[in-house]
């Protein structure tokens, strides 16, 4: 029974389909292989993260760099099928001028807060579908998910069997694929094509390698380049030649307790992947080449997961605005990616015979016998532009040939089993380095942008550059208003003109219920003196005037008489007088 159909209702499916596309939704609910069914990865590259970050962060000779880089790792499912699963990924946001016009139009027509809520909800549903816990959910630690980040975060949950999807078809044909103008083309190169178009990805390149498929994307429309394909292929080409698989059937001579430990719900004793040892005396009787071939088995032991979780020996720092994701088991030079476990009463060695097989691949040798096997690294999300790596602890102790001796007890005291899922690395207790400081600086900067967005009215766009431009315009507008108010204040209370005598004759007369107040003052001290001066210059005789006050408006009505007066002349005289008044105020304010 499909897990997705039990967890998701119709509303959830509609939201996921609106962001990922209908094909991606159907594929995730029916065809995608979960990590619980991937028991091994066929080889790995310890410098994988550095290679991906270089493709994104370091421009080439033409000053070009990709917007995202994904490595799809070759893995083998429980059924024995080859599957491409998430190996690692890295992305950056498009620079100024890299976004296409179509993406700008789409981003302007949507509500940012509503869209962010939908994205986080979809990532939460994907996380729940693949069995992650709440503390390992990277969507909870993000305040905002951009288009490119949404594409990369969603891609983590996809896996492609041979011939399925863009990476699966590239892996099956062993030929590179170069797709240009993805946004405007009607073809769907992959089940994630709708998501790629929504992120504005114009160019998608798929290059097969020895250990998987490299997927690169750019928001620019690029013509196909053979030199670029060759450089990418040479960068990811493994130094180990491809070899055929060797099956390892197990012969157990002793009875083991029925209470057998299981991994991902499957009995290790029935799955054919039991831990094996060679007896010391049998190794001495073998030829030297055979002994070297079996050295890696001496150190391959198992321990019970319920007793204690393996200690992390490798960690990667948090980064600021760049995303880097690692899949469990892809950062070590091992073939077996999941955490192996040991039955509680299992103490006797198991004899293993090695017979040839017709499988296409074989288990590649591990590191030298002097190195310990490292536990698989957890999926993590890094938030910075740096691609620094923490050093691995590969020190060896005397007599320690087992993984349990190498990793020791969990120092944090957390004894529960390690769960699958994508957990952000920002919860580690480690010394603050420059990468962590950069991440915190970016978080503070984002908070300042949110505060600025809340006080700036009439925001044209939601991006940071437009917000800064709108803020500058708003500040200039406020500065201009401030100058006008200062000039008005100088005119009213701090004018440099000499004070005019306000000797007024006030006469009050009472007639019944009516009270008549007459104020007689000099013309120069009256506010309407300039209007009377304009009438005099125009040789206009004022017959009567009336003053009325209505709320905040003063209406002064004049009845005038003139033989040569016209409407245009009177308006011109009053306007000229008003202009002279403003100029005198300005000069006095200086």
Curated annotation (Swiss-Prot):
InterPro entries: AIB/MYC-like, bHLH_dom, HLH_DNA-bd_sf, MYC/MYB_N. Gene3D superfamilies: Helix-loop-helix DNA-binding domain. Pfam families: bHLH-MYC_N, HLH. Residues 429-478 form the bHLH domain. Residues 281-293 have a biased composition (Low complexity). The keyword Nucleus applies. One of its GO terms (biological process) is negative regulation of gene expression. Residues 416-425 have a biased composition (Basic residues). GO terms for molecular function: DNA-binding transcription factor activity; protein dimerization activity; transcription cis-regulatory region binding. Induction: By UV treatment. It comes from the Eukaryota. Keywords: DNA-binding, Nucleus, Transcription, Transcription regulation. Residues 274-296, 385-439 are annotated as: Disordered. It is found in: Nucleus. Its main location: nucleus. SMART domains: HLH (SM00353). GO terms for cellular component: cytoplasm; nucleus. Homodimer. This is Transcription factor bHLH13. The gene is BHLH13.
